[in-house]
Structure formats: structure tokens, C-alpha cells
Amino acid sequence: MKAHILNLKAYVLTVALGAAFNYGVAAEKKSEASDTKIYQHFIIYGQSLSTGHQSYPALTTEPLSGNYMIGDQIWINQGNRNSAILNPLKSSLALTEKRSPLSRNGGIAECPIVAAVNHLRLKINDPSVNYIATSTGVGGKTIDQLSKHCRNKNIYQEGFLKAAFAAPQIAAKENATVTCPLVIWMQGEYNYWADTTRGLLPHIPNVVGKDEYKTLMLRLKNDMQNDVVSIYNQHSKPLFITYQVGAQYTRGRTLNIGMAQLEAANETEDIICAGPVYPMTDRGGH
């Protein structure tokens, strides 16, 4: 995947990230002493576009000062061996991919949250604030499977919640403060067709309708926001950023899932739609 393609996708996310600061959730006031170390944690969740599937080789290999990741890599999963420490933020081939044969189409390597947070650092370079970026999603999953209340999978608990608990624990060891100003949601492709193995409950198909998807998306947003407020002990709910699913995954004439995402953003104050994906080239849909 060419660098300019990744940079364009990261730019779309970064515009939305900047909007979060204007919205005010990223500047939560703290009463601690001015010399207290401050972290802001940016979490991305969803399916394969959120994780950076088919993005080999890694491009963002030089870390920027003040930007960090949890453990060995940007992904809290994908073989990450240590969720108790911070390391400088950079891209790499996922540990689960190390022994896989690499091809022009293969490899989880360049997660979009890396370039987005790096761009944010370059544009809003406040040296008093440190950024943590984490990818928590899993490729090829429906919103049903990624939901907190799914009975088929524990992806939410093993991904999003694991990262959310890790950051405050790390900050506490450093006597630092940490907030989560926003979460990014990149998903929708696998909800364009029904499958009885991909629903909220065993043997129940996943949702495919616009209203049903929007209901689950709003429920997921509320779950993530409420968990963040509780875990990080912060006053403001994190902003929720989505994109509008597209490319070859869409089905039908009414674009049910894409319209659900757009409507949710238009109707809900704390949701931003970063934009559609159709103007950007891709590799196998990524």
C-alpha cells in the first residue's frame, strides 16, 4: 500500500481528531500540580480496516517524542506480550504475522491510528501532553460480535476493555493522569449480509437493516463512553468517531449500513462521521 494512500486515510481521521479538541472533551481540566505527567489515550475499535489488515510493509517506523503505545505493538491483541508498559509509538508487523508468509496482499502492519495520532502531534504539539494510541479490534467481525453484550464472542472485553484498563494502571504507576478523549469506530463491512454464526446470540443472524444497525451502534457508543468515564474516572464522555463503510462490501441500492452510520452522526451530538472511503484506493478492500 502506498504511503500517500495511508496518509490520506490518516488525514481523514486526524480532521476528526482535531474536532474532538474543539468539542472540548480532550481538554478535561485537572486539579493536579502542573508537573504531573499527563496522558491522553486514543483507542480505535472495529474490524480489519481499524487494525490495518493488508498494509504490509510498515511505514511509520520512526517514533515521535511524546507518543506511546501499550506493550510491544500498537495492537492490544495480535500477540501483544506486555500490556503493563509503554513503548514509543511506531508501526511494525503484528507479532501474530511474524511466521506467516508475506505477500503483496498480506500482513497487518500499518494501523491507521498510528499516523493519525502522529499527525495530531505535529499539528497540536503540546509538550505537556503525551499521547497513547491503541488498536483493539478484530478483522472480519460484525457489530453484533464486537458488541459488549455479545454471547458468541468476548472481543469487547479482550480488546477494548483490556486497553481501557491498561492505560490507567500504567499511569498510576507513574503518578500520572490519563483521560480518553475519543474512540474511533471503523466497521460495517460484515453487516451487509446475514450469517447465523455472527449474531449477538448463538444461532441468531447478525443485523443487516439500517435501523437495527444504528440501534446497535448507538448502544455500543454508549457502552464505550460509559466504560471510559468509569474506568478513567473522567467527567466528560469521549467523542465517538465513525466512518461511512463502502467499497466492494456494500450491497443493495439503499446502502443500509453506510446510511445508518451517517444518520447516527447527523442525529447525535457526540458522533462525528469522518467521511466515506470511496474516494480512496484500497488493497483488497483495505
Language-model region placement:
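Bacterial N-terminal signal peptides that target proteins for export
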Residues: 2-12
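Bacterial N-terminal signal peptides
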Residues: 11-20
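Cell-envelope and extracellular/periplasmic
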Residues: 29-286
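Sec/Tat signal peptide C-region and signal peptidase I cleavage site
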Residues: 22-26
